[in-house]
Amino acid sequence: DRGLAGHLVEESLSFLRRRAADFLGISETQNLLDQLEQVWPATVRQVVPKPVTVILLADVLRRLVEEGVSIRDLRGVLESLAQVAHAEKDPLNLAELVRANMRRALTHQLTEGGVDLEVVLLDPMIEDTIRGAISRTAAGSYLTLAPAAARDIVRSVQRAHESASAPSNVVLTQPDVRRFVRK
């Protein structure tokens, strides 16, 4: 039955898209680099293995893919890393910096080539609350927001989303709080 087969293919593709980061390891990253090096050898040699190891690059790519960010422009990813990797080694921060450099491609993806992008803009007071609840340790940064405050923030974003003239799945925040809002 073609309907069942089509549904099975769609479900399989959907699963693979959601879990794509699980299939991106060190070997796959090295394969991507080998392919890119055939076309852009100087770009690859400028970034890998110094200042970015294949292990670190795999971690950054995985984080981007987990968020649905296309890594099709691997050259652009490497060029972004070349600009910041000498000063930054945290894969979370590197992924955020690469993501910010890919803003045009992300916007194009979200607007499907259109001009307008409807967003929910996070209130600066909420951002300040989140910013104040970020704890930084040697092991990384984490959010120490009280559960009640977290629920209030989520409700506030949901209300803003529901009252928008054209509902959006995009919540616009300052870069330093974005990954905590995303969670």
Language-model features: locations:
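Membrane-embedded alpha-helical signal segments
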Residues: 1-183
